[in-house]
Amino acid sequence: MVRRVKTGIPGMDEILHGGIPERNVVLLSGGPGTGKSIFSQQFLWNGLQMGEPGIYVALEEHPVQVRQNMAQFGWDVRKYEEEGLFAMVDAFTAGVGKSKEYEKYIVHDLTDIREFIEVLRQAIRDINAKRVVVDSVTTLYINKPAMARSIILQLKRVLAGTGCTSIFVSQISVGERGFGGPGVEHGVDGIIRLDLDEIDGELKRSLIVWKMRGTSHSMKRHPFDITDKGIIVYPDKVLKRGRIYEL
C-alpha cells in the first residue's frame, strides 16, 4: 500500500484518489495569479493541523510578507514556529537588513546550490519536517536554465532521502505550454498545473494533474476557486471547451 499525504485542500485529494504518495516531489506549475503560492501554503498549513511539521522556502517574497499573506487566510504560522513545528527558510533577503536578526535559516548566496541544500537540510533535521515547499524553484535556475533539471534532481535526492513530501512551485509565463524550465518535468514525481483562462470575457481558474507517480488520478481539467479560506477544487465538475460541466 502506498502511504499518502493528504493535501487537505477541499476536493483535491479526491482528484488524487486519496492524496499525494509519500516522498513524492510535485511540480506545481502555473502562470502569474493562478494560486500557486496559496495552494502550497494551504498544503503546509493543513499538514500542521495533522501534526506534520513543515518548511516554506521563500525565494520570491520576503518571509515577513509570506507570514502576512498566510495569516490573511487564517493560517497564522508564528505559534508553530515558536513550537518548532514550522520553519521559514529565507532565500530572498540574502540576510540583508533586519532579516538576519529574526530569521533562523538564511541562504546567503543563491548561486551556491550546495549552501541552499545545506540550509534546507539543517531546517528539515531541526524540526523533523514532513512537508516542504520551495516557492519558487524557478528562481534557482532563472539565470542558468540549462541547470534546471540537475538542480531539481539534487533537491529531490535530498528531500526524498529525508522522507519529506514536497511541492516545488514553478513559474511559467502566460500562454506558455511547458512546465517551467527545460527538462524539469522529467525530474519530478508529479505535476499539477494551475491555469487562468479568459473565457467569454471572464477569467476562470482550473487545474489538471499531469502526472503523479504511485497513484492513479483524475485525467480531467477541474475548476477551482480561491476563497477567503483558501482554495476549493470541484472534483465533480470539469472545464472543457470553455464551459463548466457537472460530472
Swiss-Prot record:
Any single Pfam family the record assigns to this protein: ATPase
SUPFAM superfamilies (UniProt xref): P-loop containing nucleoside triphosphate hydrolases (SSF52540)
ATP-binding found in the keyword field: yes
Domain KaiC: 3-247
Keywords: ATP-binding, Nucleotide-binding
Molecular function (Gene Ontology), one example: ATP binding
Top-level taxon in the UniProt lineage: Archaea
Cited InterPro entries: KaiC-like_dom, KaiC_dom, P-loop_NTPase, UPF0273_KaiC-like
Entry binding sites for ATP: G30, G31, P32, G33, T34, G35, K36, S37
Keyword Iron belongs to the record: no
Protein family (similarity comment): Belongs to the UPF0273 family.
Protein name (Swiss-Prot/TrEMBL): UPF0273 protein PF1931
Organism: Pyrococcus furiosus (strain ATCC 43587 / DSM 3638 / JCM 8422 / Vc1)
